[in-house]
Design a protein with these regions (language model features):
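Transmembrane alpha-helical segments of multipass membrane enzymes and assembly factors
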Residues: 121-141, 180-181
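Membrane-interface alpha helices of multi-pass inner-membrane proteins
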Residues: 184-208
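Perimembrane helix-loop-helix junctions
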Residues: 7-9, 201-216
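Short acidic/glycine- and proline-prone juxtamembrane loop motifs at membrane-interface regions
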Residues: 157-165
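Membrane-interface transmembrane helices that cradle and orient dolichyl/undecaprenyl
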Residues: 135, 165-167, 172-185
Length: 216
């Protein structure tokens, strides 16, 4: 009887953890749905970053286009100097997130897909990382913890505006998860994340202290 009781308690705990995971996903989906219904899909940031990358691929300095030193390209559009501008290397690395070689409509589909695929891949890798290093013992808790990449409400805003922040954060998390297996891959992911150095730069210091030279 005691064994049966213990099994039932364990079963109930698993059901509770599974319910927590499903509830968490439901809250995140509802939050995104609320923004979509009441605010709509803007993708303003995505368009701006795409324009900058596209001009660079056409051999033009986006800052020259912004300040009307060179004429804009009709198929790309004019750049607003009050909104545009980022770190110089992001005009090249940014093509991974906002590919300037694609038409704008195709880029919109691409970044929306990336906004969902990147967190899912990150959650999978993070869950495996947590289990492998025994930060958690239960797979349901590992799933719940890894799904925290969807937790900030700003993730929904990043989707609506096509902002790079959510994808950049995923790159940072992935780089830390794969560091032990491949410093080169970790470094490449961190390089893409440097499109937003205010997010990624701080992670170079622990890599430096741990002497992960390849990643740096």
């Amino acid at each position: 009887r005691e064994g049966a009781t213990a099994l039932m308690q364990q079963y109930d705990q698993r059901r509770l953890r599974l319910f927590a995971v499903v509830l968490f996903l439901g809250i995140m989906a509802a939050n995104l749905g609320r923004y979509l219904i009441f605010d709509g899909l803007y993708l303003w940031d995505a368009r701006l970053r795409w324009q900058e990358c596209a001009y660079v691929l056409h051999g033009l300095n986006p800052f020259d286009v912004m300040h009307s030193r060179v004429p804009s390209i009709e198929s790309i559009g004019w750049l607003d100097a009050s909104l545009g501008g980022t770190v110089p290397w992001a005009y090249v690395l940014g093509n991974v997130i906002n590919p300037g070689f694609l038409p704008y409509s195709a880029m919109c589909v691409y970044i929306l897909a990336l906004d969902f695929i990147a967190p899912l891949v990150t959650a999978l890798c993070m869950g495996r990382f947590l289990l492998r290093h025994r930060y958690v013992q239960d797979k349901y808790m590992a799933v719940l913890a890894s799904l925290l990449v969807f937790a900030p409400s700003m993730w929904a805003n990043a989707v609506l505006f096509g902002n790079q922040s959510g994808i950049v954060c995923c790159c940072v998390i992935l780089s830390m998860c794969v560091l032990e297996d491949s410093e080169t891959l970790a470094g490449l992911l961190l390089a893409v994340a440097m499109c937003k150095p205010q997010v990624a730069f701080v992670f170079l210091f622990p890599l430096l202290c741990k002497k992960h030279w390849k990643a740096i």
